[in-house]
Amino acid sequence: MIDSHELKRRDSYLNKLIGFQDTEPVKVITGIRRCGKSSLLKLMVQHLKDTGIQPEQIIEMNFESFDFRGMSADDIYHYVKERVVTGKRMYLFFDELQRIEAWEDAVNAFRVDLDCDIYVTGSNAYLLSSEYSTYLSGRCVEIKMLPLSFREFLDFHGFEVRETQSALGGLRKQVFDKNGERYELQEVFDAYMRFGGMPGIADVGLEQEKALSLLDGIYSTVVIRDILEREKRRGQKQITDPMLLRKIILFLADNIGSSVSIASIGNTLVNEGLLDDGKRKGAPSAHTVQAYVNALLESYFFYEIKRFDIKGKAYLRTLGKYYIVDIGLRNYLLGFRNRDSGHAIENVVYFELLRRGYDAAIGKIGNAEVDFIATTADEKMYIQVTESMMSEDVRKRELSPLQSIRDNYEKIVLSLEPGLDASYDGIKSENLIDWLLSE
């Protein structure tokens, strides 16, 4: 078991958990495997101990561990009941609870029978699917966890950003490691775009071979445990072809940020000869492809973003896009080469918006498109993402959709080369890396 003093803090998530401490809802932490959910539970346990909660009031169960293998919901209930300290509030931590059949029965029993505060993690959205959410309706709060942001990446890898003065007197940001070695900010951002934000990369270092090995382990675990095995446990027979699953994963990874329909996935795989293994005749049905894509969404491997008609003020049912949860996983799947970097930085912006609490949609305005409409309960902004704003043609292409939106919400173009102009008729032009580093 990892000691929590060795763990890097992820304050944005920990503070959310602390904010819900000792409230009735079950705290459910969701996200792809190995994005840091178990570590977050450890940090919360340490916080409880630091604030006076006695160790005997805390019960931790990790259902990936051999210690708790094969347990039923009844077994969990009795295990906890035997360890309850009379007259004290208990703090219950259940890691990867979706592996237990009828887990919700035990959780509900604890809520009824004990004075307790419950924390749960799960690597599959099935944990909170409609089938089970009826049991916890209104009684749970979901904390959605993602791999490291660029700021967290810097922290986890021991980098510090400092402003230094250039020979001409201007200020520029540079990065220093623990040994005082200096790097250009772009160089470290390139490493983030190469290796991604899985926390485990910080343990093995920024070396391609070690990173590939770690990412291979994550990929295999997600596919085998969270998709193929889960389907067997559910008694469903939809996800039965590991080869088709991998081909769909590769297709979606290669087409992040591109408009994709379910029909186009199957047709493309057939037309490009990607299913010519002698076993499958013709294109897989749309129903089959949808089932495989849903399984990938439920395992938090990919996220779907919908299109929103800005003038009609309605979501469109056709041609959404998919983004991959970690750019390092994409590079592991497709190869570590500079491919489609425009969509790759778009991918990074999408997940940064989610981290900051925004809902994101693609904006449709006439025949044009805005990369992201980002909204919260009281805020809205339109965002375009491009590699460079140095070319007149690119500026026109990126600014035109924003200029055609007739409202007063903030409009921003994020790029790695914003040029000299900080704004164009009220549309901000910002450096993407500076935006990622901002609060």
Regions found by a protein language model. Name each.
Residues D117-S123, K144:
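Structural recognition of the conserved hydrophobic beta-strand(s) that form the central parallel beta-sheet
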Residues Y126-E142, L154-F159:
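Short regulatory helix/loop adjacent to the ATP-binding pocket of P-loop NTPases
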Residues I59-K88:
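Short glycine-rich substrate-engagement loop in P-loop NTPases that contacts/grips substrate
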Residues S4-D22:
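Pre-Walker A adenine-sensing motif
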Residues V85-W103:
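Conserved P-loop NTPase "ATPase switch" module shared by AAA+ and STAND
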Residues L7, V161-A344, F351, D359-A360:
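Interdomain hinge/linker elements that couple catalytic modules in large macromolecular machines
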Residues I2-L7, E24, T30, S39, ...:
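A cross-kingdom feature that marks ATP-driven nucleic-acid transaction machinery
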Residues G36:
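Conserved glycine(s) of the Walker
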